[in-house]
Structures are given as C-alpha cells and as structure tokens.
C-alpha cells in the first residue's frame, strides 16, 4: 500500500510537470521584446546626423525601438511621410518615401545613381534597403532592382 501511495505521488508530480511544460510552451512569449516609443534624443548620433543632413527641418513624428529578427532597430517616422529605419549602431538600414515620392538622392550610393541615370532615367528612388548582400531599390514605378554590396546591378526582382 505504501508503495502505491509513493507511485501515485510520483505520477501526480509527473502530470503536474507535463501540464506546466505544456502551458509554458503555449504562452505568448515568442516576442518578449516589444516596440517601445522613445524620444528622438535617444537616437544614436549617427542617426541624428543622417536626419539633419537629408531631412533638415523635417519634424520627427515618432521614434520606436523595434526588434526585427531579434535585432534592435530604430523606426523613425517623419512629418513628411518618409520613414527611416536605423540599425543598432545608428546606420540607416531602410529609407522609404510615400507612394509616388522619392527619397533624397544623396542617400543612394553614386554607382547605383549612375546605373539608374543610364537605364531608368526619370524614375526616382521610392525606397532603398540595405540587405546582407547589398541593396534593394524600389523605383517610383514600383520596379524593384537588386544591387550587390559594391552597387553593381544584379537583377530585377518583381518581373
């Protein structure tokens, strides 16, 4: 009888452990890091310098610290509708203008600008994103072009 009580205790303990394990694995904790609105003063100096150079006089609407693929980024919304994403060290990762508008030309690397002038003259850059392999550039006509890290054209993405 004592042996039966001891086995029952172990069985109940095992059931409770399994239940706790199941409940914890189903919890909504896969995004522990939440978006946090912060003051523009919290931006790294590199980001502030970028905004001052390319968006001088444009008011910052909001700054949010976000985690994209567990990497901290600063998402900055500007009063003119442009959005700039900065990496953890403050370097720009993406610059996006509203539909039909262009981003400031000085942001795009010169070799890419030269390519666009030759092959897509008259179509400004609506969005540019730094990727692990180079750059993705969206033109105002919604054509997506991919360039390597040196700015050499690779392919058209959405054909």
What are these regions (language model features)?
Residues 27-30:
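Bacterial signal peptide processing site
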Residues 12-20:
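Hydrophobic helical h-region of N-terminal Sec-dependent signal peptides
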Residues 2-13:
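Bacterial N-terminal signal peptides that target proteins for export
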Residues 2-4, 35-159:
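First exposed extracellular module after export/assembly in secreted or surface-exposed proteins
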Residues 21-25:
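C-terminal motif of bacterial Sec signal peptides marking the signal peptidase cleavage site
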């Amino acid at each position: 009888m004592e042996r039966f009580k001891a086995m029952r205790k172990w069985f109940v303990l095992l059931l409770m452990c399994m239940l706790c394990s199941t409940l914890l694995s189903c919890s909504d904790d896969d995004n522990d890091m939440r978006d946090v609105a912060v003051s523009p003063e919290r931006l790294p100096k590199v980001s502030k310098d970028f905004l001052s150079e390319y968006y001088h006089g444009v008011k910052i609407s909001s700054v949010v610290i976000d985690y994209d693929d567990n990497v901290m980024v600063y998402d900055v919304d500007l009063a003119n509708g442009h959005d700039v994403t900065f990496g953890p060290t403050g370097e720009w990762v993406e610059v996006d203008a509203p539909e039909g508008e262009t981003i400031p030309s000085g942001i795009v690397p010169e070799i890419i600008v030269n390519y666009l002038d030759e092959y897509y003259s008259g179509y400004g850059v609506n969005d540019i994103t730094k990727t692990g392999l180079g750059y993705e550039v969206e033109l105002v006509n919604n054509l997506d072009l991919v360039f390597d890290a040196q700015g050499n054209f690779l392919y058209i993405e959405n054909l």
